[in-house]
């Protein structure tokens, strides 16, 4: 799951080397804290949150086969 998030976000940002993803594992929930360069923050979030919402939808669809819930948080 972490690799998929990283692959998607690296395709959006200008500075892919600045991406950090921390994973917190719960019983049925996976939380991913994504940190990107401040310049790329707007690209990841997108206009009115469309990009991050789309990323969350894709990741949640992939997590359904494992009966997991995924939360993606953008942190600074």
Regions found by a protein language model. Give the residues of each.
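RNA-contacting regions in translation and RNA-metabolism proteins
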Residues: 1-43, 52-53, 57-76
């Amino acid at each position: 799951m972490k690799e998929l998030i990283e692959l998607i976000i690296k395709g959006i940002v200008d500075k892919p080397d600045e991406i950090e993803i921390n994973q917190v594992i719960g019983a049925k929930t996976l939380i991913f804290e994504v940190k990107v360069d401040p310049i790329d923050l707007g690209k990841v979030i997108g206009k009115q949150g469309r990009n991050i919402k789309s990323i969350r939808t894709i990741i949640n669809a992939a997590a359904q086969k494992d009966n997991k819930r995924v939360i993606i948080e953008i942190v600074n």
